[in-house]
Amino acid sequence: KKRDQEDVSDPNARSHSTIISIPNAEGVLEQFEVYEASNFDPALQARFPEIRAYSGKGLSDKGSMLKLSISPQGIQTMVFRNNGKPNEYIEPYSQDHTVYAVFKSQRVKGGLPWTCSTQDQQLAAGLNNRVNELGIEADNGVLKTMRLAQSVTAEYSNFFGATSSAQVALVLAAVNATMTRTNGCYEKDLALHLNLIPNTTDVFYYNPATDPYTFPISNWNAQLQATLTSVIGEANYDIGHLFGASGGG
């Protein structure tokens, strides 16, 4: 059975799989069987039911895996290919999110708008260090879940149109899009899934003059640790990370 975008995002159907079709980089529609794979603690997901994440297995290309995020700001996808094929992405192309672009991982996107790809790389690098510190093994066959305290600078929030906590959903939607892709990599390579903690939005900031992160970027590690210790508490998360709009994280 095929369902449209509204059906896929229906929280009442989140425990069931659904078959959807999305275009690949060659312009051919491919089918995937998808199911919900939230990046949020259940309490956080309950607060933001309109922001969701899904995983899917390929039906047209049996070896492919889909990661899909959805919010009122639109959808983003990442398709993992096997046999050395490049991964593929779908992202909004137009400002109003009515036009989307499909591209392969090795292609330079040129005129496409700013995307979270840089954030993906930064998050992966930071988490890889933490994973190594914790001695997590990738080959034991058990999917592990860790609690992520994700903070963002005011500049990051402002980039996505959020200038106050009333617009927190704009920021969380952007973070969710990055987390969806990053979790795809970690689930595939390390059997590891990261869930945003319930109060991660407490360390989202909106005013550059008052947020706790100052330049140079080399200050951020210590400032992030101090912020998470003060606001979140060290017993309440496993990994802490920061997004900034200037290329740091």
PLM feature segments, named:
Residues 96-249:
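Fold-level signature of zinc-dependent metallopeptidase catalytic domains
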Residues 2-154, 186, 193:
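Propeptide (latency) domains of metzincin metalloproteases
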